[in-house]
């Protein structure tokens, strides 16, 4: 790809400025390709947030907006590289035997650029010629001199592919109309159909999927070929689902829940809460009727709060996994209610995979108790879990503004009492 020095100089000069302002004042003169420069400025700005390592390299070319939006973040790409390295080591390949990776759905090449570094040979396959041109330009700048770029259809390449160490795929999650699809059968290439051929070519196949998929069903669809399931989140937002396929038959795959530095792993058979995965929208939908008439004002005078010293809220990966039994067994926490997905304990837990709070006081919706609970409060962060009111309705009822250092959790306990817990957030890892 030929880009003039004037265009590169223009990009370097203006890349930290508002793209709209640059577009308004740019002079269409000389060798500067202004449309290309504007696209690159916007791409660099997105990369500086999502891919800081990439943004630190001068001369990279960024693709149009859609591939940039769909590509992995630096965190998730590095996670896959570490996973690939571990899987390679577990295969116990001869030290003298060269290792090889084939990425059949190369895209912008972010995952490939990190994963390929742990292999001796790496092949990037992409059917869009523009992305292949960008990859050929970018990979040498990123130090990937061992990378080979193939512009072809993934299934055509798979047909002629020899034996390799690992195959990686990120099936497209958009249909012909451009809308998102969330069933693996709707994704292309069709990994379910290609499963046997993929595993004939490589002993390990890693598949990246939408976090919106029902991972239990997806694992079942692969009929015992799934060795590991990785639910990867960052900033408490579930980003992707990774399946590791192997040549054996795996009744209980390893499930790994990762959220930034928090990692919890377990065997699928260890959790009896199967098929219970929860999203934020599902939690919100569990408000039973959204009316004050349904609120219980039963007094908490006889309330046994001996275990209610600390409150624990699982992170997004744990919620997606639905491994609530594992949490109770491993961390000695107690479910407030099976439908609330909040946990309490008598002791602080340093490594709980989620947020933790110190409970200051507890009240039912009894007016006298609420008044005592809210004493001195003008602001609070409010969350509802399995509660009849929305956050907005409860905030209005309690007459509190948003913000401050106090966190109120409104929920329902196992006896059906509607409770409000006044808490303070604890630092991660503190006791």
Where are the language model's segments positioned?
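SAM-dependent transferase fold signal centered on methyltransferase-like domains
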Residues: 1-431
């Amino acid at each position: 790809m030929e880009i003039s020095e004037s265009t590169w100089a223009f990009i370097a000069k203006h890349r930290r400025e508002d793209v709209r302002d640059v577009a308004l004042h740019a002079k269409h003169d000389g060798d500067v390709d202004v449309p290309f420069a504007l696209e690159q400025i916007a791409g660099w700005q997105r990369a500086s947030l999502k891919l800081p390592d990439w943004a630190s390299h001068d001369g990279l070319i960024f693709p149009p907006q859609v591939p940039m939006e769909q590509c992995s973040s630096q965190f998730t790409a590095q996670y896959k590289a570490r996973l690939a390295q571990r899987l390679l080591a577990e295969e116990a390949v001869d030290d003298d035997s060269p290792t090889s990776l084939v990425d059949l759905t190369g895209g912008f090449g972010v995952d490939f650029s990190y994963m390929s570094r742990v292999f001796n040979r790496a092949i990037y396959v992409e059917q869009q010629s523009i992305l292949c041109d960008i990859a050929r330009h970018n990979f040498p700048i990123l130090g990937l001199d061992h990378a080979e770029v193939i512009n072809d259809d993934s299934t055509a390449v798979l047909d002629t592919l020899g034996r390799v160490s690992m195959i990686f795929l990120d099936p497209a999650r958009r249909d012909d109309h451009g809308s998102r699809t969330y069933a693996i059968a709707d994704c292309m290439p069709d990994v379910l159909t290609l499963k046997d051929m993929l595993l004939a070519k490589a002993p390990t196949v890693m598949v990246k999927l939408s976090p919106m998929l029902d991972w239990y069903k997806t694992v079942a669809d692969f009929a015992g070929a799934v060795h590991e399931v990785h639910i990867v989140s960052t900033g408490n937002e579930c980003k992707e689902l990774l399946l590791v396929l192997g040549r054996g038959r795996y009744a209980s795959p390893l499930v790994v829940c990762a959220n930034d530095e928090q990692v919890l792993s377990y065997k699928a058979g260890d959790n009896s809460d199967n098929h219970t995965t929860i999203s934020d929208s599902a939690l919100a939908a569990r408000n039973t009727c959204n009316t004050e008439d349904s609120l219980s004002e039963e007094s908490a005078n006889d309330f046994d709060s001996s275990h209610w010293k600390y409150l624990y809220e699982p992170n997004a990966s744990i919620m997606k996994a639905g491994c609530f039994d594992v949490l109770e067994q491993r961390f000695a926490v107690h479910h407030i209610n099976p439908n609330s997905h909040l946990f309490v304990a008598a002791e602080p837990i340093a490594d709980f995979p989620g947020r933790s709070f110190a409970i200051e006081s507890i009240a039912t919706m009894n007016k006298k108790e609420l008044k005592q609970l809210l004493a001195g409060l003008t602001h609070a962060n409010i969350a509802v879990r399995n509660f009849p009111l929305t956050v907005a309705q409860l905030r209005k009822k309690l007459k509190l503004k948003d913000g401050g250092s106090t966190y109120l959790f409104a929920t329902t306990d196992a006896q059906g009492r509607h409770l409000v817990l006044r808490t303070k957030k604890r630092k991660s890892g503190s006791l």
